[in-house]
Protein backbone atom coordinates (compact mmCIF):
# COMPACT_ATOMS: atom_id res chain seq x y z
CA UNK A 1 0.00 0.00 0.00
CA UNK A 2 1.02 3.65 -0.29
CA UNK A 3 3.22 5.50 2.21
CA UNK A 4 0.28 7.55 3.55
CA UNK A 5 -1.53 4.31 4.40
CA UNK A 6 1.53 2.96 6.23
CA UNK A 7 2.91 1.01 3.26
CA UNK A 8 6.22 1.27 1.46
CA UNK A 9 5.25 2.32 -2.08
CA UNK A 10 4.36 5.55 -3.84
CA UNK A 11 2.11 4.55 -6.70
CA UNK A 12 1.88 8.14 -7.95
CA UNK A 13 5.62 8.50 -8.53
CA UNK A 14 6.06 5.22 -10.42
CA UNK A 15 7.11 5.74 -14.08
CA UNK A 16 3.79 4.37 -15.37
CA UNK A 17 1.64 6.36 -12.90
CA UNK A 18 -0.98 8.85 -14.04
CA UNK A 19 0.11 11.54 -11.59
CA UNK A 20 -1.56 14.63 -12.96
CA UNK A 21 -2.83 15.85 -9.59
CA UNK A 22 0.32 15.43 -7.52
CA UNK A 23 3.22 17.51 -6.16
CA UNK A 24 5.03 20.07 -8.24
CA UNK A 25 7.10 21.23 -5.25
CA UNK A 26 8.75 19.52 -2.29
CA UNK A 27 7.97 16.02 -3.52
CA UNK A 28 9.72 13.31 -1.57
CA UNK A 29 8.62 9.78 -0.73
CA UNK A 30 5.01 10.98 -0.90
CA UNK A 31 3.78 13.20 -3.73
CA UNK A 32 0.22 13.69 -2.48
CA UNK A 33 -1.04 17.27 -2.33
CA UNK A 34 -3.49 19.02 -0.03
CA UNK A 35 -6.48 19.11 -2.42
CA UNK A 36 -8.44 21.58 -0.30
CA UNK A 37 -10.00 24.75 -1.69
CA UNK A 38 -10.39 26.51 1.67
CA UNK A 39 -6.83 25.67 2.84
CA UNK A 40 -4.92 28.29 0.80
CA UNK A 41 -7.55 30.92 1.63
CA UNK A 42 -7.26 30.19 5.35
CA UNK A 43 -3.47 30.41 5.21
CA UNK A 44 -3.57 33.62 3.14
CA UNK A 45 -5.96 35.23 5.64
CA UNK A 46 -3.77 34.12 8.59
CA UNK A 47 -6.54 32.05 10.14
CA UNK A 48 -6.07 29.99 13.27
CA UNK A 49 -7.60 26.64 14.08
CA UNK A 50 -9.06 25.91 17.51
CA UNK A 51 -8.63 22.23 18.38
CA UNK A 52 -10.20 20.50 21.39
CA UNK A 53 -9.76 17.12 22.98
CA UNK A 54 -10.29 15.58 26.42
CA UNK A 55 -7.13 17.30 27.69
CA UNK A 56 -8.17 20.81 26.67
CA UNK A 57 -7.88 23.25 23.83
CA UNK A 58 -5.05 24.48 21.64
CA UNK A 59 -4.81 27.01 18.83
CA UNK A 60 -2.73 26.35 15.72
CA UNK A 61 -2.02 28.78 12.88
CA UNK A 62 -3.55 27.58 9.59
CA UNK A 63 -0.06 27.62 8.08
CA UNK A 64 1.07 25.08 10.72
CA UNK A 65 -2.13 22.98 10.66
CA UNK A 66 -1.18 21.02 7.54
CA UNK A 67 1.58 18.47 8.07
CA UNK A 68 4.42 17.56 5.73
CA UNK A 69 5.13 13.86 5.12
CA UNK A 70 8.64 14.42 6.51
CA UNK A 71 7.02 14.99 9.92
CA UNK A 72 4.55 12.09 9.78
CA UNK A 73 3.85 10.46 6.45
CA UNK A 74 0.54 8.94 7.62
CA UNK A 75 -1.09 12.28 8.56
CA UNK A 76 -2.00 15.37 6.57
CA UNK A 77 -2.84 17.63 9.54
CA UNK A 78 -1.72 18.07 13.14
CA UNK A 79 -4.99 16.57 14.38
CA UNK A 80 -4.48 13.65 16.74
CA UNK A 81 -7.00 10.75 16.85
CA UNK A 82 -8.98 12.32 19.73
CA UNK A 83 -8.87 15.92 18.41
CA UNK A 84 -11.80 17.87 17.06
CA UNK A 85 -11.46 21.06 15.05
CA UNK A 86 -14.09 23.25 16.71
CA UNK A 87 -13.49 26.75 15.37
CA UNK A 88 -11.68 28.53 12.58
CA UNK A 89 -10.78 32.11 13.49
CA UNK A 90 -10.07 34.61 10.74
CA UNK A 91 -8.54 37.81 12.13
CA UNK A 92 -9.37 41.20 10.67
CA UNK A 93 -5.76 41.64 9.50
CA UNK A 94 -6.89 41.74 5.87
CA UNK A 95 -10.20 43.55 6.44
CA UNK A 96 -10.79 45.98 3.60
CA UNK A 97 -8.24 44.27 1.37
CA UNK A 98 -9.00 42.82 -2.04
CA UNK A 99 -9.34 39.04 -1.89
CA UNK A 100 -8.97 36.77 -4.88
CA UNK A 101 -9.45 33.02 -5.25
CA UNK A 102 -9.03 31.05 -8.46
CA UNK A 103 -9.24 27.32 -9.06
CA UNK A 104 -8.33 25.27 -12.11
CA UNK A 105 -9.97 21.84 -12.26
CA UNK A 106 -10.90 19.39 -14.98
CA UNK A 107 -14.59 19.00 -14.20
CA UNK A 108 -15.70 22.15 -12.47
CA UNK A 109 -15.94 23.54 -8.96
CA UNK A 110 -16.81 20.19 -7.34
CA UNK A 111 -13.60 18.50 -8.57
CA UNK A 112 -10.22 18.39 -6.84
CA UNK A 113 -8.10 21.31 -8.04
CA UNK A 114 -5.18 20.98 -10.42
CA UNK A 115 -4.08 24.18 -8.71
CA UNK A 116 -5.77 26.94 -6.77
CA UNK A 117 -4.53 30.26 -5.47
CA UNK A 118 -5.74 32.64 -2.80
CA UNK A 119 -4.48 36.19 -2.51
CA UNK A 120 -5.20 39.07 -0.18
CA UNK A 121 -3.92 42.39 -1.50
CA UNK A 122 -3.90 45.78 0.12
CA UNK A 123 -3.94 48.22 -2.80
CA UNK A 124 -3.91 52.01 -2.77
CA UNK A 125 -3.91 54.13 -5.90
CA UNK A 126 -3.21 51.09 -8.05
CA UNK A 127 -0.07 50.17 -6.08
CA UNK A 128 0.16 46.95 -4.03
CA UNK A 129 1.07 47.88 -0.45
CA UNK A 130 0.91 44.36 1.04
CA UNK A 131 0.22 40.87 -0.24
CA UNK A 132 -0.52 37.42 1.13
CA UNK A 133 -0.49 34.79 -1.63
CA UNK A 134 -0.89 31.03 -1.19
CA UNK A 135 -1.15 28.24 -3.78
CA UNK A 136 -2.94 24.97 -3.14
CA UNK A 137 -2.73 21.49 -4.69
CA UNK A 138 0.91 21.95 -5.71
CA UNK A 139 2.62 20.33 -2.71
CA UNK A 140 1.72 18.43 0.45
CA UNK A 141 0.77 21.62 2.31
CA UNK A 142 -0.61 24.95 1.10
CA UNK A 143 2.36 26.76 -0.47
CA UNK A 144 2.93 30.29 0.79
CA UNK A 145 4.47 32.29 -2.05
CA UNK A 146 6.69 34.55 0.04
CA UNK A 147 9.01 35.48 -2.83
CA UNK A 148 6.00 36.42 -4.94
CA UNK A 149 4.56 38.49 -2.08
CA UNK A 150 7.87 40.37 -1.82
CA UNK A 151 8.02 40.88 -5.59
CA UNK A 152 4.54 42.38 -5.96
CA UNK A 153 4.68 44.57 -2.85
CA UNK A 154 5.39 48.14 -3.93
CA UNK A 155 4.55 47.47 -7.60
CA UNK A 156 1.61 48.61 -9.64
CA UNK A 157 -1.29 46.18 -9.85
CA UNK A 158 -1.19 45.44 -13.57
CA UNK A 159 -0.59 42.73 -16.17
CA UNK A 160 3.20 43.15 -16.05
CA UNK A 161 3.27 42.53 -12.29
CA UNK A 162 0.95 39.54 -12.73
CA UNK A 163 3.24 38.04 -15.41
CA UNK A 164 6.32 38.47 -13.20
CA UNK A 165 4.47 36.98 -10.23
CA UNK A 166 3.31 33.98 -12.26
CA UNK A 167 6.80 33.26 -13.56
CA UNK A 168 8.27 33.44 -10.06
CA UNK A 169 5.48 31.30 -8.57
CA UNK A 170 6.38 28.32 -10.78
CA UNK A 171 10.15 28.64 -10.47
CA UNK A 172 11.57 25.46 -8.98
CA UNK A 173 8.59 23.30 -9.94
CA UNK A 174 9.50 19.68 -10.59
CA UNK A 175 6.61 18.21 -12.56
CA UNK A 176 5.96 14.49 -12.63
CA UNK A 177 5.16 12.67 -15.89
CA UNK A 178 1.66 14.09 -16.37
CA UNK A 179 1.44 17.39 -14.54
Which residues make up each language-model segment?
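C-terminal structural segment of proteins
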Residues: 1-179
